[in-house]
Amino acid sequence: MLQNPQLHYLDNAATTIVAPEVADVIDKAMREHWANPSSLYGPGACSEEALNAARAAVARTLGCKSRELYFTSCGSESNNLALLGAVRTRTFGKGIVVSGFEHPSVQRPLERLAKQGYDVTVVAPRADGTLDIAAMLERVDKNTILVACMMVNNEIGTRNDVEHLAAEVKRRNSRTIVHVDAVQAWMRVPIKLDNIDTLSVSGHKIHAPKGIGALYLSDRLVQAFQPPYLGGEQERQMRPGTENLPYAMGLAAAATRLAKTMKSRDTAMRALNRQLREGLKAFPEVVINSPENAVPEVLNFSEMCIKSETMLAFLAEEQIYVSSASACGRGQPSHTLAAMGRDPLAIDTAIRVSFCADNTPEDVDAFLNRFEDGMKHLQKIRK
């Protein structure tokens, strides 16, 4: 999708480029479905029909009912909506259990809830960056109203067995709500909603535009759910404000497109990941932070020599675009690596490379070549 062959975009965990066919759907929707879906006249009814079709398409990719799928502006909003709304459905306790490497859009709402009197327990991940499921389950008791975790870590790509966690949580306390942040998992790994009550996804991670996301809200919670927003009746009173129909249609187009290619994309991503891992073996200083069983789209490593920001600036001059941590934590050290117990040098020199189906072996070669140049040049300057 990039027109410049000299540019190598390898930061797809931060955002993806909008697919041309998705952009076409959005452009057409803006011209043809301009009416408010809530309007009672003909064009409004057409917009409502298109909105319902988009909702059904996204719901199919998640395996949920259309009525359980709510459009939002992004994954972060979905997390906030789920967490702040779900806890109000439970009055039997104040306990909340969360993993120690969650996205800020999960961390911050729970910090607010802690100030409001909720008992929030943060469980550190295992040394390999995966959920410590046993430790999380130990904290679940009769007073636990919520357990929150991410399915795929946004910084190192670890894949967590949230299905097992959810099942065990429900076995210990059937009334405990399980929320899953699936922003980095959607269209990368299969999602099973059994025992999961709320789940968030985002458009701009799957080649849809920024500004659109979705929340799965189980029928089990709907009646008691108390959304934090007030206003109109849109999204069945869960999220007021006129729906962004063109972007909802774009999200549906992007999800439908990728759902057809999950297996082939996984094979291609694994090949790129192996190529990068093999190439990094030429640098004895490098320590790989992403375990072998992480999703192949993400590879995080520490080069243990040059600060990330310095290396990233050098690579950017060469039109190689990668990152050091979550884009939502700009300028901040990786809290994921810190939670894993990595030392300060490993954290300060961490680099995240993340792929999409548009990347090629040539992108990996370009990165490795420029990275080698950067190591030589920047070490020479440092001396």
Q: Which residue stretches match the model-derived regions?
A:
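Pyridoxal 5′-phosphate
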Residues: 1-383
